[in-house]
């Protein structure tokens, strides 16, 4: 793993392919601007072949003057290349697994190589910087992938795990492709339907030689989704010391923006961007945090745009006192213990709004749940 990984966010393409998700033009513009301001290097902003309205939205985003490099997803069709906006680079997608080439395209490997060579040449003759995307790369023959990258004269090659069949330990397959494309290799992961592992597989791809990776905010995407932008960026920074140029303090606000625009609720304990990730109930954790935060934290919530809190329940009195201080209330041990007992009863009553122990101390809604549950 060398240098800094380039983040290519595809919320406006693969993210919007999530069943039931469609962004308005204003939402697309707001999200693109937020990602650009945060420092995301590349944005995939649509599919020209989807029609006139989609092309108008692409042109609108392209006209914003963003710092990010803009790309669009294109099939290996002359019509797709003609439909793209002049302000964006094409990412040419071609099926590369035998089952796709033969069953979907009724072609052969030799035919696919000829098409790749011809379309890439056409794009370059028009002065375009091309990225070649290999659909279903994870099920393709590695020698064929190298041949495809070679006939395309080694553009960036996007290795797409289209069906989410790779596990993190299979990333070594990328070493050969990385050597063949010299030096740029992109990686696009889809969440396996068996386990949510896209962020880890993407990190493994970086270790295997990927220089560019695809993400979507909140992991939006077809089927079980894509690698979440926030998880990949923060993991690269914390685990591997890689700064992708993204302002991590903006991640929480961007997540909120996309949550509203997509109408897809984000779990309260979603990694990185939700406060519950930094909320503690276990007595040993609360006690440790009040003594010294370092042993129970690899980072601090404000770095990711989140906040920290203790949580009501059967936590020790010391934690209860800390929580009440967050509410601006002074109390003794007995009062703190009584509050904790009341919170436990409120939580067991399963209030419809999820109050009680699930509420951090800084949310006074937990107090309202106490009377019905026989609280303090």
Swiss-Prot record:
Function (record text): This protein is a Fe-Mo-cofactor biosynthetic component.
Catalytic reaction list: acetyl-CoA + 2-oxoglutarate + H2O = (2R)-homocitrate + CoA + H(+)
Gene3D superfamilies, alphabetized: Aldolase class I
Family according to the record: Belongs to the alpha-IPM synthase/homocitrate synthase family.
One function term, GO molecular function aspect: homocitrate synthase activity
UniProt lineage: Bacteria, Pseudomonadati, Pseudomonadota, Alphaproteobacteria, Rhodospirillales
Keywords annotated in UniProt: Nitrogen fixation, Transferase
Superkingdom of this protein's organism: Bacteria
Domain (Pyruvate carboxyltransferase): residue spans on this chain: 5-252
EC number of the protein: 2.3.3.14
Pfam families: HMGL-like
SUPFAM superfamilies, alphabetized: Aldolase
GO biological process: nitrogen fixation
Gene from which this protein is expressed: nifV
PROSITE patterns from the UniProt entry: PYR_CT
Broad EC category: transferase
Organism of provenance: Azospirillum brasilense
Name of protein: Homocitrate synthase
């Amino acid at each position: 793993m060398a240098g800094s990984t380039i983040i290519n966010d595809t919320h406006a393409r693969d993210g919007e392919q999530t069943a039931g998700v469609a962004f308005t033009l204003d939402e697309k513009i707001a999200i693109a601007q937020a990602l650009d301001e945060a420092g995301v290097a590349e944005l995939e902003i649509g599919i020209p072949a989807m029609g006139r309205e989609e092309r108008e939205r692409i042109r609108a985003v392209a006209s914003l003057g963003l710092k990010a490099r803009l790309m669009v997803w294109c099939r290996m069709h002359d019509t797709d290349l003609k439909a793209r906006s002049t302000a964006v680079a094409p990412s040419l997608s071609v099926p590369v697994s035998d089952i796709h080439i033969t069953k979907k395209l009724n072609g052969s490997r030799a035919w696919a190589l000829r098409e790749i060579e011809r379309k890439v040449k056409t794009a370059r003759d028009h002065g375009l910087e091309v990225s070649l995307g290999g659909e279903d790369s994870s099920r393709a023959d590695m020698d064929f992938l190298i041949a495809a990258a070679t006939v395309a004269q080694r553009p960036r090659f996007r290795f797409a795990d289209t069906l989410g069949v790779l596990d993190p330990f299979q990333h070594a397959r990328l070493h050969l492709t990385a050597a063949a494309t010299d030096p740029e290799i992109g990686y696009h992961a889809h969440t396996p339907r068996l386990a949510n592992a896209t962020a880890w597989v993407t990190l493994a791809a970086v270790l295997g030689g990927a220089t560019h990776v695809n993400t979507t905010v909140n992991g939006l995407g077809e089927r079980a989704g894509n690698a979440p932008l926030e998880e990949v960026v923060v993991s690269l920074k914390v685990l591997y010391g890689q700064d992708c140029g993204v302002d991590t303090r903006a991640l929480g606000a961007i997540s909120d923006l996309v949550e509203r625009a997509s109408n897809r609720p984000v779990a309260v304990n979603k990694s990185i961007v939700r406060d519950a990730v930094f909320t503690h109930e276990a007595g040993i954790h609360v006690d440790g945090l009040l003594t010294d935060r370092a042993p129970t934290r690899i980072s601090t919530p404000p770095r990711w745009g989140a906040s920290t809190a203790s949580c009501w329940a059967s936590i020790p009195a010391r934690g209860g006192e800390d929580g009440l201080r967050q509410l601006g209330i002074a109390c003794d041990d007995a009062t703190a213990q009584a509050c904790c007992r009341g919170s436990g009863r409120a939580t067991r009553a399963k209030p419809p709004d999820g109050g009680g122990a699930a509420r951090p101390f800084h949310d006074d809604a937990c107090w309202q749940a106490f009377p019905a549950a026989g609280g303090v």
